[in-house]
Amino acid sequence: MSSEFLAELHWEDGFAIPVANEENKLLEDQLSKLKDERASLQDELREYEERINSMTSHFKNVKQELSITQSLCKARERETESEEHFKAIAQRELGRVKDEIQRLENEMASILEKKSDKENGIFKATQKLDGLKCQMNWDQQALEAWLEESAHKDSDALTLQKYAQQDDNKIRALTLQLERLTLECNQKRKILDNELTETISAQLELDKAAQDFRKIHNERQELIKQWENTIEQMQKRDGDIDNCALELARIKQETREKENLVKEKIKFLESEIGNNTEFEKRISVADRKLLKCRTAYQDHETSRIQLKGELDSLKATVNRTSSDLEALRKNISKIKKDIHEETARLQKTKNHNEIIQTKLKEITEKTMSVEEKATNLEDMLKEEEKDVKEVDVQLNLIKGVLFKKAQELQTETMKEKAVLSEIEGTRSSLKHLNHQLQKLDFETLKQQEIMYSQDFHIQQVERRMSRLKGEINSEEKQALEAKIVELRKSLEEKKSTCGLLETQIKKLHNDLYFIKKAHSKNSDEKQSLMTKINELNLFIDRSEKELDKAKGFKQDLMIEDNLLKLEVKRTREMLHSKAEEVLSLEKRKQQLYTAMEERTEEIKVHKTMLASQIRYVDQERENISTEFRERLSKIEKLKNRYEILTVVMLPPEGEEEKTQAYYVIKAAQEKEELQREGDCLDAKINKAEKEIYALENTLQVLNSCNNNYKQSFKKVTPSSDEYELKIQLEEQKRAVDEKYRYKQRQIRELQEDIQSMENTLDVIEHLANNVKEKLSEKQAYSFQLSKETEEQKPKLERVTKQCAKLTKEIRLLKDTKDETMEEQDIKLREMKQFHKVIDEMLVDIIEENTEIRIILQTYFQQSGLELPTASTKGSRQSSRSPSHTSLSARSSRSTSTSTSQSSIKVLELKFPASSSLVGSPSRPSSASSSSSNVKSKKSSK
């Protein structure tokens, strides 16, 4: 720096460099300090500016957040308002729906009443008609007899004819009226059905609207939640931004510090460059060491080979030790067996000895005398002792052998453990060595591969060189020619095989075409069967739904029953509470009487106590007055004594006389003390007087209470308040009794209602059980049908195949591709039979459920068809047996049935879910389902 400055000044080298004096040095120091302060102040200024910027950005974010929260609050308020609005709408709608339901119920009730009235009228009219018909028959007979008897009375005959005509007219009018009423009834039913459908549709619309509203509400909630989440995220981000701003300021500070460090590091770098040269030298030394390591590696490789040899020898030793161990185990097992045999033999000998002893005893007892017995026994004992000693010796020997063997076994087990541990160690070392071997083998293989590739490359280069030179061997030529011949032969063979394969492929294509056709037929059949199965499943589902409805109805009845029970319980509780109130009032009356008696006794006791207290207070007052008098007399005495003392206590001559002030002070002190005592006594007197006054007041109160109590025992006059209260209480009691009787009547009625409800519940349960039984029967029947359909599938396939073959043969014979007249005739008969079956089914349904007749009639009229009646059923039943066989034969032809079904006009019958249809099983709602059921029945037959 100084050299540059001197160069700018054109300072010559010969002259000495100028040095600043002390003042300039101080100025330079001050300047450097000021520069440092300036730099620090600039840094602080930058920091403050950055803080201001961050604060302004934070303020903006806060403002934005505030606006967002306000908007969110407004949205919440709007949501609450909308919810309240919707709630109010829903409540109004609910009220309207309730009114509508009530109106409909009233209308239903009125319609039912009208219906019952009409039915009664029809019944009466029919009864009258029957009576008139009977009269007509009787009148006709009488008329004929009378005409035979008197033919000459023409005028009477004319009158009779007139009456008969009048009767006929009446009958016709009644029949017309009956028909008109039935039509009106049908119309009313139609109107009722329409109303039902309208209500159901309105209900569905309402449900849909409610669902839509719920969806919208949920979406709105989700939006608000998303909004809240976004706000939270924004807040988090704002916090992150603030943190980042702080971090940025900190980083900037760090960068400044690091810049200073960098300057220092540059100098350090220059020094490190010098060090690097030294390290390069060291690296060269390390390379030399690496060469040495490689040589060492080769040495290790040789040692590895040696270790491998040692490992093999160790393996051999391990195998040898394992075989020795096995032999030892076998020996131990043999020794154990020998010991077991020896112990068994010893036991046998002991048993044998015992048997011999018993025998000896028996023999000696029988034959020998006492002395002989004794001598024999002694001999036997000696022999036995000898035997026992011998056995003991043998046992000791065996024990010694066993002990030795056990020790040997322990040593062998210890050896085995040691050998096993050695084996484990050798195994682990083996694994390690094997791993190293694998690594080395892998490296050698790599090296060999490289070698082979290099050799192959060299050979290829040599061949290319020879070819370039034009050198080809005769052997190579011959080999190439032989290869060409072989390739030609293989080409011809492949051509022939290719031709064969093409022919086979054509055949396979044909087979595939036929298989596809068969598969399509099978799929159609499968689809038809699946539709049948689906229809059966629908039937089962409907029956299950009806069962669920029955269960729901049962549950409603149970709920009503429980509600009634609750009402009964409530009434009982009310009754009990009223009874308890009556009892409590009576108890209260008795308690009042007892309390009055107790109170009188207490008042007497209190009187006596007060009298004694008054006496005690009078005595105290007399005592205090006596004390007061005594004290006054004492004061007089003290005064006299004082005068005497003053005379006595006059000082003798020569002594100083006590001053008058002394005696005045002393007297004042004594006076004050006396005054205090007097004040205390006055206070006590005042207190006693007050107590006396209070006692007098209590005495007056007691006297007034006693007077009232005495008056209460007097007879009550009609003009008094007590008499009026008594009358009121009696009236209340009468009202309570009447309520009690009314409640009892209500309870009886409720019990009767409960009984009737229980009876109806039993009936409903019985109906539900019947429905369940029917459902189980239907399920079993459906399962049977599905089984039968599965069984009929192969037959159907066979029949369809036969039919297809026959139709093909017939068409080939007639040289036509279109349908023949016979086929059309068969289809027509099938159609007729199908219609007959459907008609029979409809007639059966109408017979089972008379209410469905009107619905079916309306649907048939809409589609321009006539409803089948029961009169046609008989004729159809008579013709069913011959046509049944033809139908079962024709039902196997799936192709013809599928075409015939396509031409049928489908009637969609939608029945109302009324309670009258609970008992009857639900029918399929389309002609296709009924046809499938009929077919399945026919196939099962």
UniProtKB/Swiss-Prot annotation:
Residue numbers bearing the Phosphoserine modification: S892, S900
Protein localization: Cytoplasm, Cytoskeleton, Cilium axoneme
InterPro entries for this protein: CCDC39 (IPR033290)
Positions of region (Disordered): 868-941
Protein name: Coiled-coil domain-containing protein 39
UniProt organism field: Homo sapiens (Human)
GO biological process: axonemal dynein complex assembly; central nervous system myelination; cerebral cortex development; cerebrospinal fluid circulation; cilium movement; cilium-dependent cell motility; determination of digestive tract left/right asymmetry; determination of liver left/right asymmetry
Stretches of the chain forming a coiled coil according to its record: 16-122, 164-273, 306-605, 665-825
Gene Ontology CC terms: axoneme; cilium; cytosol; extracellular region
Keyword list, A-Z: Cell projection, Ciliopathy, Cilium, Coiled coil, Cytoplasm, Cytoskeleton, Kartagener syndrome, Phosphoprotein, Primary ciliary dyskinesia
Pathological condition linked to this protein in its record: Ciliary dyskinesia, primary, 14: A disorder characterized by abnormalities of motile cilia. Respiratory infections leading to chronic inflammation and bronchiectasis are recurrent, due to defects in the respiratory cilia; reduced fertility is often observed in male patients due to abnormalities of sperm tails. Half of the patients exhibit randomization of left-right body asymmetry and situs inversus, due to dysfunction of monocilia at the embryonic node. Primary ciliary dyskinesia associated with situs inversus is referred to as Kartagener syndrome.
Low complexity biased stretches: 871-903, 914-934
Organism lineage: Eukaryota, Metazoa, Chordata, Craniata, Vertebrata
Tissue spec. comment: Mainly expressed in nasal brushings and, to a lesser extent, in lungs and testis.
